[in-house]
C-alpha cells in the first residue's frame, strides 16, 4: 500500500440536471464526481435532505488516475422530487475528522417564466440594427481618415521633392 503525504480525501464536483432533460424526460439526473482520493475503497449513497431513507442510485467503476482514484455516482429523480434538496453521502477513510462527507445538491426550479416573444424580438432587432449601423459608421470613418492620411502624405512628399529639386540646381540653401 502506498501512502500519500497530501490531502487524499475525495474532492467532489457536482453536476445538476439540464433544463432540456427536465422538460423532455420529466426527470433530472444529479451527478457527483469524486476525484483525487486514496485508497480506492469508498462508499457512496444518496438521500433527500431531511430523510434518512437511502435512494436508489448508480455508480461508475473506481478508476485509477496517476497515484489517486476517481469515481462517479448519479441519482435520477422524478420531476416531483426536483424541488427537494438531495445529499450525496461519501464515506472514505481519509475524510476530515473521519466524518462522512455530505455534498448538497440544491433543488431545481422547474417553473419556467414565459415572456412575450414579440416584445423581446423587436428589442433584439433594434439592438442588432443599432450595432450594425455603429460598426458601419466606424468602418467608413476609419476609411476616410486613412484616405486623408494618404493624401496628406502625397502632398508633403511632392513639396519635399520639389524643394530638393529646386535646391539641387546649383544653389545651396
UniProtKB/Swiss-Prot annotation:
Please give the CDD domains that the UniProt record associates with this protein.
Answer: IgC1_TCR_gamma
Q: What's any one GO cellular component for it?
A: external side of plasma membrane
Q: What would be the name of the gene that encodes this protein?
A: TRGC1
Q: Which PROSITE patterns match?
A: IG_LIKE
List the transmembrane segments.
139-161
Q: Please give the subunit comment from the record.
A: Gamma-delta TR is a heterodimer composed of a gamma and delta chain; disulfide-linked. The gamma-delta TR is associated with the transmembrane signaling CD3 coreceptor proteins following the stoichiometry: a single gamma-delta TR heterodimer associates with one CD3D-CD3E heterodimer, one CD3G-CD3E heterodimer and one CD247 homodimer forming a stable octameric structure. Upon activation, gamma-delta TR complex associates with FCER1G to initiate intracellular signaling.
Location(s) in or outside the cell:
Cell membrane
Gene Ontology molecular function terms on file = small molecule binding
Would you list which residues are glycosylated? 66, 120, 126, 135
Q: Name one GO biological process term.
A: adaptive immune response
Task: Please state what the protein is called.
Answer: T cell receptor gamma constant 1
Q: Which Cys-Cys disulfides exist here?
A: 32-88
- Where is each Ig-like domain found? 10-104
> Per its UniProt record, what InterPro entries does this chain match?
Ig-like_dom, Ig-like_dom_sf, Ig-like_fold, Ig_C1-set, TRG_var/const_region
The alphabetical list of record keywords is: Adaptive immunity, Cell membrane, Disulfide bond, Glycoprotein, Immunity, Immunoglobulin domain, Membrane, Receptor, T cell receptor, Transmembrane, Transmembrane helix
Q: What does this protein do?
A: Constant region of T cell receptor (TR) gamma chain that participates in the antigen recognition. Gamma-delta TRs recognize a variety of self and foreign non-peptide antigens frequently expressed at the epithelial boundaries between the host and external environment, including endogenous lipids presented by MH-like protein CD1D and phosphoantigens presented by butyrophilin-like molecule BTN3A1. Upon antigen recognition induces rapid, innate-like immune responses involved in pathogen clearance and tissue repair.
Amino acid at each position: 500500500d502506498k501512502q500519500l503525504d497530501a490531502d487524499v480525501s475525495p474532492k467532489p464536483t457536482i453536476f445538476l440536471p439540464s433544463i432540456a432533460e427536465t422538460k423532455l424526460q420529466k426527470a433530472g439526473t444529479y451527478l457527483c464526481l469524486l476525484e483525487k482520493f486514496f485508497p480506492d475503497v469508498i462508499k457512496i449513497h444518496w438521500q433527500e435532505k431531511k430523510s434518512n431513507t437511502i435512494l436508489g442510485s448508480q455508480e461508475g467503476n473506481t478508476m485509477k488516475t496517476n497515484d489517486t482514484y476517481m469515481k462517479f455516482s448519479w441519482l435520477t429523480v422524478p420531476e416531483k422530487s426536483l424541488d427537494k434538496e438531495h445529499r450525496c453521502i461519501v464515506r472514505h477513510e481519509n475524510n476530515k475528522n473521519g466524518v462522512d462527507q455530505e455534498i448538497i445538491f440544491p433543488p431545481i426550479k422547474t417553473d419556467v417564466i414565459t415572456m412575450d416573444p414579440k416584445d423581446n424580438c423587436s428589442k433584439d432587432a433594434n439592438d442588432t440594427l443599432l450595432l450594425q449601423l455603429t460598426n458601419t459608421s466606424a468602418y467608413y470613418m476609419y476609411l476616410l481618415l486613412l484616405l486623408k492620411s494618404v493624401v496628406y502624405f502625397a502632398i508633403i512628399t511632392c513639396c519635399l521633392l520639389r524643394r530638393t529639386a529646386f535646391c539641387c540646381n546649383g544653389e545651396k540653401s
